[in-house]
């Protein structure tokens, strides 16, 4: 049984993950096999420090030991999950574990800046540490079904992914919640986006990405009214329309985490994760420029 550690308790994900890995306080159809959360560091928070005190006892109720330092956690675990609510905290929270070569999963958003994203990737490569990231929205039942159906009626010519895109101080623009719909889009389209245009209003974002092969993918992120998740896929032989349920999203993500830590095979390549972050940063930049196109290669390029 793989021993997992959690780092930073300012998100409900620490409760959701602990319950599923440890098979407690959730229905049996939510149980995950192959790994167990054995210890965690409550840590600190730049976005919601008041939430830690509420989530910590719920995590402890799952049988998780509380420790205070990375060294203590390193003595107890085989792999870690960095769960800080703020993407800007992930680099420093992950650093001691990556430097120790410990397999690491980073929760959303992977990073809030291109510099941090590159630094995380470089730490993993330098210390030969297994590192990956994914949104739970990649792992819904509907997305998995849609991906299998594409094999029958593809190829895919484009897609529209939609869902909530609430903003929060600490995770700029689409990085906070728009990342979920963006990861849905990339799960279908794959990497290769060159440029984005974001027509943003206080109510929503409409981001059009253009891929190297001419395909276009759209992220529609809402901040008012009903904000369900869903996706439209435009294929050679038809148009597929899927409303997406999150019922099994956490379970499927947690199972993917356990399986990936066992196999050391990342379901989402690190280069794709870096492109997703660059896409979101470019979308935020396009919004600042009143919808002007932004090349992904502009992000982080100071020349």
Which ranges hold each PLM region?
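N-terminal glycine-/serine-/threonine-rich beta1-alpha1-beta2 phosphate-ribose binding loop
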Residues: 1-100, 125-126, 287, 296
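Hydrophobic residues in well-ordered beta-strands that form the structural core
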Residues: 68, 106, 131-133
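C-terminal helix-rich "cap/oligomerization" subdomain common to oxidoreductases
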Residues: 72, 76-84, 260-303
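Aromatic/hydrophobic pocket-lining residues that form π-stacking "cages" and hydrophobic walls in ligand
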Residues: 93, 120, 146, 282-283
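Short helix/strand-capping hinge loops at secondary-structure junctions
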Residues: 101-103, 108-109
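A contiguous active-site-proximal alpha/beta segment in oxidoreductase catalytic domains
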Residues: 111-171
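Rossmann-like dinucleotide-binding domain that binds NAD(P)(H)
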Residues: 160-226, 271-278
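Interdomain hinge/lid region at the active-site interface
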Residues: 225-265
